[in-house]
């Protein structure tokens, strides 16, 4: 991702508008302060039960997070899967870096999750419909992903 946000990709407006200049500058600052690490493998196990998987597609460095919870493995897909419909139909989100990797990322996300009921999309409103908040105070903000979703 760093190659993308500091390189020729940013000469294309559709890519550039997705990033804030100050955020890119902050990442470069962190790099110079030796406070930034890069994942260089396709799969990065950062702690027991926590794995990052590089899938690419939407962006050059798109990753998903696989976490072992009380109910087993789940995948936090972030922008790799904006909406569940994308996985179900293999119809991509409108902005992507690499179409083939985006479709493959849908398949990888679903396979690593073990089913749609263990895949958490990045932007689908169904997520807040299917999972309760951890408390009333956090309704619609912090969800309990340890339980099975209430899919209608």
Annotated model-derived regions:
Residues 51, 61-62:
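Glycine-rich, charged/polar anion/phosphate-binding loops
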Residues 56-60:
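A short catalytic or substrate-binding loop motif that flags glycine-/basic-rich loops and adjacent residues
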Residues 62-66, 70-152:
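Cap/insert and terminal regions of metallo-dependent hydrolase folds
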Residues 1-54, 101-116:
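Metallo-beta-lactamase
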């Amino acid at each position: 991702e760093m190659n993308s946000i500091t390189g020729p990709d940013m000469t294309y407006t559709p890519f550039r508008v997705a990033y804030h200049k100050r955020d890119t500058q902050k990442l470069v600052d962190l790099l110079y302060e030796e406070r930034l690490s890069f994942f260089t493998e396709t799969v990065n196990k950062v702690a027991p039960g926590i794995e990052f998987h590089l899938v690419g597609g939407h962006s050059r460095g798109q990753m998903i997070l696989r976490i072992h919870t009380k109910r087993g493995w789940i995948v936090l897909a972030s922008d790799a899967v904006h909406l569940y419909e994308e996985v179900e139909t293999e119809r991509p989100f409108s902005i992507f870096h690499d179409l083939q990797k985006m479709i493959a990322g849908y398949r990888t996300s679903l396979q690593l999750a073990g089913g749609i009921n263990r895949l958490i999309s990045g932007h689908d409103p169904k997520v807040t419909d299917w999972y309760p908040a951890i408390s009333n105070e956090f309704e619609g903000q912090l969800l309990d992903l340890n339980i099975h979703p209430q899919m209608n």
